[in-house]
Structures are given as structure tokens and as C-alpha cells.
Amino acid sequence: MGFFSSTQPPRPATVPSDEIIPLHFWNTALCMRGTVLDISLKFDDVLDTSKLRSALEELLEMKDWRQLGARLRMNPNGRLEYHIPTRFDASRPAFAMTNAQHETSIADHPLGARIPHATSTPAIFPSPDVLSPLLRSEDAPKNIDDWICSDRPQLSIHIITFSDATLITVTWLHTLTDVMGMALILNAWTALLRGNREAVPKLQGFRLDPLTELGQRTPAEKYMHFNRVFGRKEFWWFIGLNVLDRLWYRQEERRTICIPAASLRNLCQQSSSEICASRGKEEPVPFVSESDVLLGWWVRSLYSALGLRTDQTILVNNALNLRTSLHESFTSNNSAYMGNALCMSPTFLRGHQVADEPLGQIALRIRESVTEQRTPEQVEAMTALQMQTMEQTGYLALVGDPRMMLLSCSNWHKARLFDIDFSSAVLQSSGPSSLQNPQHTGKPCYVNGVQHSANSFRNVLSVIGKDAGGNWWLTGVLRTDAWTHIEKQLHKLGSS
């Protein structure tokens, strides 16, 4: 059963001694309630599970961090609350941790051998979901009912050890935090593994939410795309067209992509040359990031793969991290924001632009659009708009036109998951990168990301990040027939 089920199991009684904190509006959106996230880290090292447990126990006993051990409840009014135990013990632990131990090499395990690895040419791998029987424990939560109808803590961690590798999977409901917030948890965990308590920041986001103040500074009407915000008619028109698309193209797949460092370097050089060619000799060359170039390549590939029209609006929605957009609103030198702190930054393109313009120009359009929308005034106006829409509908606001093609991107690379350092828990290293460069010891060589939801993630791209070798990892969900074209584009990229 899930959030939209008509019947639910009985819910546990309230523990009188628990501290009760209502969830803030940003974390209660229907899309947050309906999504469970898994992040799995693969290490070419054997890690000490007892050290991992002890450090995480220490973290969740620290004053502000105890809130992560809260139980999720829904009150009689249908509102979500955190119930924080006064103390954690074996009957009510701060987190759930399970272990599976294999005495063999990970290469000898039928699923372990299928974990993607870096390649010399662009490659596409099966859905990351196929690894779930290995990466998740049997009782790992899959929907909101698994929290509100039990006394389960917010974090579920499953650790799988082999003779030459370790896998760590963290599972949580999106109401708790986004991927950037999970990176804060992982980095605080590893800081305590090193014995560095001073590196653990204080947490904001549970009792007081700076997003509420952020949404009251600037009126929503000052948002640059306010005149394109969907009303009720446009919203249901857009939903109806998307339902028809899913009825016509019923099959969809999530796949993992590896873009080798050399291939992306060629794409970036191509983009830079194209941007330079379009400007005068005296004009400075504008900045575009590797992520901009990757997203531009993805949009161009989907234009053909999905059979889009030249006159069609294509909305590229980039997830904008509010933590970095407005530093003074969220963090001081010793504090960090825990929760969902995202706005979508739309870039409007026309089909003919994607078809006719060079890759560099598309990447530049994406970069310029993001830059325009991350000013304090625009972020504040976007936040005000989302607050108003959430209060009225429970949904996040949409902009554009109902007939547009919506392509969304979540850039996990900003969380630097491949840089998280568990080296203080390493018992034995076996990976080639660790042997060649000790700085890679205890850092993930692969990151697996999966969203569990009754909702479709079609046309959503997650940029997982860049590994130690400079290779980029992506996961995307597309209708099944579109992946054939993506494979051709990857082959073309590898041949250039």
C-alpha cells in the first residue's frame, strides 16, 4: 500500500514522552510524500561495520542531529509530524541498520557482478532497480505507509560486505530531505569516523524553517515567469496530455549511462569552440559547466528520440539548490540546512532551436537561464509562488504551456557523493584506483540511485556525478523505444 491507497494498516499510538514537531510546508508536497529514495555506495574496500554503526550512533545522539531519529506520524487532521523519542535504545533505535556478509568476491555474486563499472567508451547499463535485491534489505521501506504505520526511524541503512568490496545503501522518504541533505548526513557520519566532532555542523530546518521567511520577502508576481504559471485549466490540460502519452507509450525504463572523461572532454571542447565562433573577438567567452554541456547533449538527443516538433515548446527544468543560492538565509559557518531546499529553474526552448543550434549554444542558453533565476529576488519570488501554490493545491507550481515537452534534471553531482570519505573505516583495500592512488581509498567507485514511487519519472534525468577517473554517471527514465536512439547517440559520441 502507498500514500494514495484507500485503506491503510493501523497506526501506532503516540508515545506521550515524544517531542512533536510539525513538518514544514516544503517537505509535505505530494511528490515528497510519494517518493522513497535509495542511494547505494560501492567501495573497492572492506569497511568495518562496527565502526560505521558506532559513528552513526554518536552522530544521532548529538543535540540537533537527534531529530533524524524521529518517527513520522500523520495526525487526525492529515498533517505530517515528527515524533522524536526522548532517548534511543534497542526497542526504539535512532536508525535501522542491517548487514549481509558474503565470504566471496563481489565478482562472484550474480548481482554484484552486474554493478556498472567505468568504460573507455560511452556505455548504457540496465536499470539500477535490478540491483535492488542485493542493495536493499528485505524489509526496507518502499512507501510512506512503511513509516507512518510503524515505529520505523527515518533512516534505513543496509551494509553488504564481500571479501573485496562493501556496499552501503541509505533509504529515506523524500519528506526528510533532498540528496544535498543526505550528503550532509554522510559527510557528518564520516567526520565522526575520523574523530572530528568539530566538523559536524549544527542543523537548521526542523523547529524553524528559513524557507518560510524566504517566501515572504518578495511577492510571487516578481518571478520572471509568473505570467506563464499554470492555472487550473492549463494544469489539467497538461496532465491529460501526459496521461495520453503514457497510455500510447506504456513501457518505460530507467537506465544508467557512463560518459567517459575523454568523451565529455571532447563535448566540452566542441561546445567552447561553438560559443567562441558565435561571439566577437573582443567579447569574453561565457562560462558553461560540464553539467550544462551534458544536459545540452541530453536535450538534443531526446529531441530526436521522442520525435518532438520544431514548433514545440521544450521546457528544461533544472533543480536549483537553495542552500547555495542564498547562503545568508540558510547557513552560518557552523550550521547546515536539513530538509528539501529545491526550486525548479526552467529554461524555455523551441524545437527548432534544439534541432538547428549547435550544442554549445544550447548549453549556454541553459547556463544563462539558471544564472538569471538564481538572483536573490528571483529565488525569493519563486519560493513565494511555490508556497502559495502548495497551500492552495498541495502541488508545486508549473510554468509553461500545456502542450510543452517537460524534461527535468536533478544534478546530484553538487552533492559530491563520489568524494565522501569513509577511509577511516577501511579494513582492507583491493580496488585498482586505491592501489594506484591512496587518496581514492574509502571513496565510492560507483553510486546507484533509485526512486521508488507510484508516480512516473519519465523524462527525468539524474546527473549522479563524476567519479575519481573523471567519468560521468547519469540515470534517466524514458519510454522504452526512445532508448534505442540514445544508444545510437552514445555510439556516435564514442566515435567522435
Swiss-Prot record:
One Pfam family named in its UniProt record: Transferase
Family: Belongs to the plant acyltransferase family.
Gene giving rise to this polypeptide: adrJ
One Gene Ontology molecular-function label: acyltransferase activity
Biological function: Acetyltransferase; part of the gene cluster that mediates the biosynthesis of andrastins, meroterpenoid compounds that exhibit inhibitory activity against ras farnesyltransferase, suggesting that they could be promising leads for antitumor agents. The first step of the pathway is the synthesis of 3,5-dimethylorsellinic acid (DMOA) by the polyketide synthase adrD via condensation of one acetyl-CoA starter unit with 3 malonyl-CoA units and 2 methylations. DMAO is then converted to farnesyl-DMAO by the prenyltransferase adrG.
Free-text disruption phenotype from the record: Drastically reduces the production of andrastin A.
Protein name (record): Acetyltransferase adrJ
Source superkingdom: Eukaryota
Entry keyword set: Acyltransferase, Transferase
Pathway: Secondary metabolite biosynthesis; terpenoid biosynthesis
Positions annotated as active site in the UniProt record: H174 (proton acceptor), D421 (proton acceptor)
Organism: Penicillium roqueforti
Assembly mode: Monomer.
BP term (GO), one: terpenoid biosynthetic process
Entry's EC annotation: 2.3.1.-
Disulphide bridges, residue numbers: none
